Amino acid sequence: MPQINASIVLYHNKKEQLAKAIESFLNTNLDVKLYLVDNSSNDELKDLKSIDSRIEYIFNNANLGYGTAHNIAIKKSIDEKVSYHLVLNPDIYFESGVLEKLYSYMQNNSDIGNIMPNILYPNGEIQYLCKLLPTPVDLILRRFIPFKNWKEKRNNTYELKASGYDKIMNVPVLSGCFMFLRTSALKDVGLFDENIFMYLEDTDLSRRIHTKYKTIFYPKVQITHEYAKESYKSKKLLKYHIQSAIYRSEE
């Protein structure tokens, strides 16, 4: 039985970038398995499964959404009684040893439901991905209000920048780009909300886990995220972001 399963949701991604994420996860002495869950309109990425025998490729033949696609793999992990499931973005990469350190910390702290390492840009700068619980007003104002000083002050508070990001913290909201999840916690609080097609599904899940377990930022380990704010570039994606914020606030 694997010690850790992981899932990467695909949607017409670049194979070169995906290969870095895949190789990062599989470069471990732990017993692992990786699900590639493909939401693309064709299966041109299926040959990625030939990289390693520990990969299982799932083609949905439709864009089911981020959370729904990850849930397909998470349910398999739960059915297989795997202790941990890693939700992994396709633009993440990291050195050997990262999984071992996170696995060990989770094994020694059974009250943790989700753990996130320190996440860096490719140039080495910190990505401030520890968050307070947002409201729809926060999300909309941070996107549209032109007052730079006001936005910066609000962002500093919202992203917990005063903490220095140099100590272990129990944080209400952790990023969905790398969610190292305890499957027993997921059985307790539920999986991704499939009513949220895109954006804030990670916020919602992190919030629910945080009500019963610790959700830990662990800066002793670091990974790299080739991050891009896609919702800022696309009106359609921004619409999904706002709809998700409104839906979450109505729960």
Show the residue positions of the predicted features.
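Short, flexible, basic/aromatic active-site loop/helix in glycosyltransferases
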Residues: 134-171
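Conserved small/polar residues in nucleotide/adenosyl-binding loops
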Residues: 250-251
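A conserved acidic beta->alpha catalytic loop
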Residues: 36-47, 62
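Conserved donor NDP-sugar-binding/catalytic core segment of glycosyltransferases
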Residues: 93-129
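Short, well-formed alpha-helical segments that are part of the catalytic scaffolds
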Residues: 13-27
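Short beta-strand-to-loop acidic/aromatic patch adjacent to the donor-nucleotide binding site
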Residues: 81-93
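Glycine-rich, basic loop-to-helix element that forms the pyrophosphate-binding segment
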Residues: 61-80
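A short, conserved alpha-helix in the catalytic core of glycosyltransferases
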Residues: 164-166, 172-222
